[in-house]
Amino acid sequence: MRDKALGMPIVTSALTHGLGIVGDLFINPGDPVVLPEHFWGNYNLTFGVRNQCEIETYPLYCEGGFNSSGLGQKLLEVGEKSSKAVVVLNFPNNPTGYTPTAEAAAEIREAIVAAAEAGLRQVVVCDDAYFGLFFEDNCLQESIFGYLANCHPNVLAIKLDGATKELFSWGFRVGCLSYAAGGSGDLDAVHTALEKKTMGSIRGGISNSPNTTQSAVVRLLKNPAAAAQRKEKRDILCARANRTREVLDNGKFSDAWDVYPFNSGYFMCVKLKGGVDAEELRVHLLDKYGIGVISSSSTDIRVAFSCLEEGQVEEVFDTLLEAWTDLAG
């Protein structure tokens, strides 16, 4: 990032507010927003309902890894019917808990640049809500924003951060939005113009982000002990993720669901088998067994391993299997 031309980070009232700013500044009704098939439901509320975009999806996975070719194909398809698009890249992904490798990140950049070369103007949003929560060495260990900053005149990269998960600061509602335009002109002037538009949106929407929690985040970042404390919490999450993987490697679940690859973040997903509807299973699991999960599609169940003690993981999945069996017959 040292050699990149970047704008100044602008404080937002956490990451969701940053998404709302992006939508208000860059999305008109009917504009395409490109997402993987597994995406956070708030994107639909923010971009789909509020900004009335057209959501275009592609399969997230290909052969157990990120589907960079699928992204590239989708961008070319979108470019045939639109001159611009918003592309959202969310790693670690919510709901699946997947982060691509560095090799896949380079392929993502190539796909975006190829579409830009073909004439598609893109606003690429790097949603880094869960950044840093990586549990395998082969995960991309940096924001994909660095791959996309200044990559092409037709690409505007935007980095969104939030203290909530990155700094374990729930309820603070503090985040940042950063721009990196492409091209050979005066990028500082471009960034300044974008920053003024962004500050106008903030002023006209919420007036300002809360100063008290901003000050708390600054103190946290300056605290010499903060890095060790954050590592301690990440290690706890890593242990819970590893325990989840151990439990799910048991063949007893193979008739009920397949496990989507996961290596980071707060969550993981399973794809149900046997014709069991995910929402019906979610309600049944809650009503009969008192366990809460999320149905992210008609076939997919999201489990938050982040909130489970290691000793609870097996019980939760055993109970999920029991609930699935109730419905599968």
Where do the language-model regions lie?
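PLP-dependent enzyme catalytic core of the Aspartate aminotransferase-like
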Residues: 76, 109, 153, 280-329
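Conserved glycine-rich beta-strand-loop-beta hairpin in the small C-terminal domain of fold type I
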Residues: 211-214, 218, 230-245, 256-271, ...
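Hydrophobic residues at beta-strand termini and immediately following loops
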Residues: 12, 58-60, 160, 294, ...
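Structural preference for beta-strand elements that scaffold enzyme active sites
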Residues: 86, 121-123, 158, 267, ...
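Short hydrophobic/aromatic beta-strand micro-patches
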Residues: 178, 269-271, 304-306
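Conserved core of the PLP fold type I
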Residues: 1-120, 124, 131-151, 311, ...
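Active-site donor-binding loop signature of nucleotide-sugar glycosyltransferases
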Residues: 58-62, 91, 162, 211, ...
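Conserved core segment of the aminotransferase class I/II
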Residues: 148-235, 283
